[in-house]
Amino acid sequence: MFRGSITALVTPFRQDGSLDKKAFGALVEWQIAEGSSGLVPVGTTGESPTLTHDEHQEVIRLCVEAANKRVPVIAGAGSNSTREAISFAEHAEKVGADALLVVTPYYNKPNQRGLYEHFAAIARSTSLPIFIYNIPPRSVVDMLPETMARLAADFKNIVGVKDATAKLDRVSEQREACGPDFIQLSGEDATALGFNAHGGVGCISVTANVAPRLCAEFQAASLRGDGARAIELQDRLFPLHKALFLEPNPAGAKYALSRLGRLENVLRSPLVTVEASTAEKIDAAMKHAGLLN
């Protein structure tokens, strides 16, 4: 159920900064039509830090409603407050999400015992499958494989990880610690091919916002063992993977989607739109991938 190209959705805004619900619904429809195998609303790429609680919950509800069980919705439910994360988890379950993506607490820097207790409390609060989101560059904490293994052993609904460490050996370490059934999804587009080779089964992808069909085809080729096709698609996508992250995410993805006419190029402060020089590089990468003429 949770494998392949799973899109970490952007949250579209109007020029006045309000949620663009129409554009969001259309984005969900396009993603499903293009072959994405899952959707993640309100993660890092969804600008969760600048959404109000009501907006956070509304975006998840809209995504669940638009997806209508055609693909799984893994709702962003992370916070550096355990109580707040539990509240997000309970709401996501209530509105019909299929799973939760819970980031390791950021800024307050809990130790491994604190990480265990945080995820244990969330797991006790919901019956939904939980994916640990381990992203040390943003959270400044790194959940170690041993801690992950304890959680997976103690809670049946802690089923996998979105790994954004970009350490390919970590996939094998987590497979050894947590077992082969623990679902490992890459959180880093550029290294997703190597991630799968180590035992991963997909990617929660930023690039899939912009190139959903190519990303879906890439993941399908990789997972069926068609290395030649996977590398061919990797070569088409790699410049785009790089260009979209020249400035803080999701500025690159939103610019690219605006070039495709999918949404307004609007972010919420303190994030800002990409510089002109970056826009040129994204345009070139989109042309290389065959997304622009």
Curated annotation (Swiss-Prot):
Domain of life, source organism: Bacteria
UniProt xrefs under Pfam families: DHDPS
InterPro entries: Aldolase_TIM (IPR013785), DapA (IPR005263), DapA-like (IPR002220), Schiff_base-form_aldolases_AS (IPR020625), Schiff_base-form_aldolases_CS (IPR020624)
UniProt-annotated location(s): Cytoplasm
Binding site for pyruvate: T45, I204
Active site: residue positions: Y133, K162
Subunit organization: Homotetramer; dimer of dimers.
General function of this protein: Catalyzes the condensation of (S)-aspartate-beta-semialdehyde [(S)-ASA] and pyruvate to 4-hydroxy-tetrahydrodipicolinate (HTPA).
Protein name: 4-hydroxy-tetrahydrodipicolinate synthase
Gene: dapA
